[in-house]
Swiss-Prot record:
InterPro entries (UniProt xref): BTB/POZ_dom, MATH/TRAF_dom, SKP1/BTB/POZ_sf, TRAF-like
Top-level taxonomy: Eukaryota, Metazoa, Chordata, Craniata, Vertebrata
PROSITE patterns on file: BTB (PS50097), MATH (PS50144)
UniProt GO MF annotations: identical protein binding; ubiquitin protein ligase binding
SUPFAM superfamilies named among the record's database cross-references: POZ domain, TRAF domain-like
PANTHER family in alphabetical order: SPECKLE-TYPE POZ PROTEIN (PTHR24413)
The name this protein goes by in its record: Speckle-type POZ protein-like
Organism: Homo sapiens
GO BP annotation list: negative regulation of protein ubiquitination; proteasome-mediated ubiquitin-dependent protein catabolic process; protein ubiquitination; regulation of proteolysis
Pathway(s) of this molecule: Protein modification; protein ubiquitination
Amino acid sequence: MSREPTPPLPGDMSTGPIAESWCYTQVKVVKFSYMWTINNFSFCREEMGEVLKSSTFSSGPSDKMKWCLRVNPKGLDDESKDYLSLYLLLVSCPKSEVRAKFKFSLLNAKREETKAMESQRAYRFVQGKDWGFKKFIRRDFLLDEANGLLPDDKLTLFCEVSVVQDSVNISGHTNTNTLKVPECRLAEDLGNLWENTRFTDCSFFVRGQEFKAHKSVLAARSPVFNAMFEHEMEESKKNRVEINDLDPEVFKEMMRFIYTGRAPNLDKMADNLLAAADKYALERLKVMCEEALCSNLSVENVADTLVLADLHSAEQLKAQAIDFINRCSVLRQLGCKDGKNWNSNQATDIMETSGWKSMIQSHPHLVAEAFRALASAQCPQFGIPRKRLKQS
């Protein structure tokens, strides 16, 4: 019997994308079965190619589509003469064609299904057309009493048919009242809390400019602030902190990052913000600054950047700066820059910059590190590729 199509339940659409309108297609399939018993089967004397037919059957009294089973007891042709051939035949049909799948089996002495064979797909039937199996079962196996397939000399065939009916479409529109979880606004809310200086409990004086903040937020975000407020330090007792080694704008950008995880002005002050991030153990901000400085490396600033990276233990930035120096040195020797022809007289050599000369005097160990790396480096491909820094 057929099943009426039902629209998708709300739970089916509870995950994944939600469309404004939808369609649910139900392909109707009518399933029914038929049993055919042939009494005194061993007396069937039909020759090869001759046929026995069952009576007609259908899915129900109102179904005008009629079927029958066709058996060739001694096969259909020379190829199948040692087999029993079995087919499903469409006797009459009000439609021009119909598609159906079928399954044949035998019932043994215990009324159990055995030797089942099933169509692998839905076949196209027209009136008078049959589909089945030319070699359904070997005759010698079937006639052997030890196999129990002919109890009392009765052959019982069981057939299951699945007929594809018309498909049904159900369409509609998604309920506009579907719940939507708002996006998280934690960063915006904390940023507003700081900007509005509400419920603050400590003050920072940065070169004369006051900034109010919340101890709990700072302690949660920075191990340095956590230690400052946790112990009986003077800053914790007075709720007042003096900072004289940072510019107010740099401190403000650092605080914005602490509250929101963002630093919109980072590119303008990446070097000074790196120092602040290192001082207050803000590892993610530190790597963000390293990445910004890496993207702006040049012949003129690479030595100063290397010194800055060494001073604040920015190991990824340091490695990138040394790599930049080595690549530029090799490319200069090859007479090219960034994969293009390069006249070395038109560009300042890194070793001739004031930053490099200053580094020789103040940080000679960095010069040694750069030369050691250069000595072990191989000639690179043209261009100066940049590696993406690992975010903490």
